[in-house]
Amino acid sequence: MPKKLKILRVQKGLSQAQLAKDLGTTQKTVSSWETGRATPRPPMMQKIADFFGVKKDDIFFEAFNYFK
């Protein structure tokens, strides 16, 4: 999840602070998601997926411990 979130953010040309503002959270929180120190709660996962226009599983696959 951390790498996928950062890749999506960078592809969209956003800083952590800009993404945090768009999602209604803090830059510190976005940083903790990207480094793997924290995982967003399910409602925020959906908000992030909607923001980037992707499915939750595409970003948070590892957070759910899914196996393909």
What are the roles of these predicted feature ranges?
Residues 1-11:
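A short, Lys/Arg-rich alpha-helix, primarily the initiator
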Residues 8, 22, 33, 62:
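Residues in the recognition helix of alpha-helical DNA-binding motifs
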Residues 1-3, 18, 25, 53:
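Short, low-complexity interaction segments enriched in Ser/Thr/Pro/Gly
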Residues 24, 43-58:
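DNA major-groove recognition helix of helix-turn-helix/homeodomain DNA-binding modules
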Residues 13-32:
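Short alpha-helical DNA-recognition segment
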Residues 11, 50, 58-68:
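Short, charged recognition helix plus adjacent turn
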